Amino acid sequence: MSHNAPLVLMILDGWGYNENDRYNAIAKANTPQWDEWWQTCPHILLKASGLPVGLPDEQMGNSEVGHMHIGAGRVIQQDFTRINEAINNGKFAKNAVFHEVIDQLKKTEKSLHIMGLLSPGGVHSHEQHLFALLALCNQKKFRSVHLHLFLDGRDTPPQSALDSLKCLNEELVKHPVATINSICGRYYAMDRDKRWERVEPVYNLLTQGKSEHQFPDAETAIHFYYKNKISDEFVPPTLIGKEHSIQDGDAVLFFNFRADRARQLTSTFLDPLFKGFERKTLPKLSYFVSMTQYDKNLITTIAFPPVPLNNTLGEVLSSHGLSQLRIAETEKYAHVTFFFNGGCESVFTNEERIMVPSPQVATYDLQPEMSAPELTKTLIAAINSRDYHVIICNYANADMVGHTGNFEATVQAIECLDQCMHQVWQALKNNGGKLLITADHGNAEEMFSEATNQAHTAHTSEPVPFLYVGGGWHFTHAEGSLIDIAPSLLALLGITPPPEMTGRILLEKNHAHV
């Protein structure tokens, strides 16, 4: 399996396009390779947010949604939209899983512990989903509910938890079924990099009520943390009011709908082979409900089970006998594999995967290059091996460093990426390969919000670039959306896209002049 001129699809995570140079780390960075391509190579802009990627109108894009749409070549109704619709049409309040759990807890006189990200961000969760759960508990006259709230500050402004708490308290006046028993920044509760030292104090708080920090109410705690320059994301695990830890027979409901940052905390309760840290206690739960499927190996009761997708890009390449490589650093590995394959765990025939470890630093502005140099070396070796027809890679820097809100560090990250792109193209050129470059959503092109007068750490709703390097082809449309990438890539390979792919082919071969 060799002598292939490889086609590389490079996904620059969080690299959006913004005409406005102000607060734009991409525009500020010195990017000779990118600038040369932008002036000389075919390129267009793609929509990567809202309705074109199965999200509510004007909702910013995110990595999971972006990669699913790049890989699927069709609009997929996202879990966020599915759950919103279920709330609006009354199906949420009739969900059999919720009713079964509450009925069982009423019988046994045990408690329901609802945990998740209290946020209007719509990336990992939405607070309206929590509010709908409270309304359902009230409708069923079930009042033994304890809330364990994770704070955002990453997909929302860094200090915005008080706004969400105000909305929650208004709901608790209407539906007086629950008490807030703990708060914690997502940095701890929603780690996805096996940094168990972050997750352990969250687990101890949830299962033993143990915390170095205790306050009578959530607002007092947050005011204290803000005074000490600790924003929402980094609030340490904190006990609120009277201790109500998770006991035998209780049920846990995790209302995050996005899987990647829910898996680790879920595994502390459910993984029989768990080795992250020593669990002093392991409650025997009656149920662990997850809003969606977090991992096929974590046996949760799923409120909104997955809808399977057929004929994603990976499957089509495999069925045509082509070899493919997926490569990313830890932070985005799930995105180029699980999410790119439509939320499917299985690996296709002739699909290989390489994960380059992400650096172990507290926040990525401390190492803006992340593991891009190592990733580039590995990618170049794969290109030179000529073992793969298609290589799908992700560079995490623009997104992960952009999330820190540190402008200068994000500029450094972009400059590092430009050098990496240059090196990758030299290897591709030497092997007769082609390069498609795009992004899953915006981030680094807008680093400060004048509206909130805070760093803009969240994703944006800006379009993303779609650039072709390799000659012989041109774009036929002035703009597109992420679902057009897979059909266009297949066209470059001479493969007709399957009927499931409703995205358009945006590239056409140049006609030879007679």
From Swiss-Prot:
NCBIfam families reported in the protein's UniProt record: pgm_bpd_ind
Residues that hold Mn(2+) 1 according to the record: D399, H403, H459
Catalytic activity: (2R)-2-phosphoglycerate = (2R)-3-phosphoglycerate
Cofactor, how bound (note): Binds 2 manganese ions per subunit.
Taxonomy, superkingdom: Bacteria
KW Lipid biosynthesis (keyword) present: no
GO molecular function: manganese ion binding; phosphoglycerate mutase activity
InterPro entries for the chain: Alkaline_phosphatase_core_sf, BPG-indep_PGM_N, Metalloenzyme, PGAM_B_sf, Pgm_bpd_ind
Gene field: gpmI
Record family assignment: Belongs to the BPG-independent phosphoglycerate mutase family.
Organism: Legionella pneumophila (strain Corby)
Active site feature: S63
Biochemical pathway: Carbohydrate degradation; glycolysis; pyruvate from D-glyceraldehyde 3-phosphate: step 3/5
Subunit (UniProt): Monomer.
Function comment: Catalyzes the interconversion of 2-phosphoglycerate and 3-phosphoglycerate.
Name of protein: 2,3-bisphosphoglycerate-independent phosphoglycerate mutase
Positions bound to Mn(2+) 2: D13, S63, D440, H441
Gene Ontology cellular component annotations, sorted alphabetically: cytosol
A Pfam family annotated for this UniProt entry: Metalloenzyme
Binding site for substrate: H124, R154, D155, R186, R192, R258, A259, D260, R261, K332
Cofactor: Mn(2+)
EC number: 5.4.2.12
Enzyme class: isomerase
Gene Ontology BP annotations: glucose catabolic process; glycolytic process
Leader sequence segment: none
Record-linked HAMAP family: GpmI (MF_01038)
Key words, A-Z: Glycolysis, Isomerase, Manganese, Metal-binding
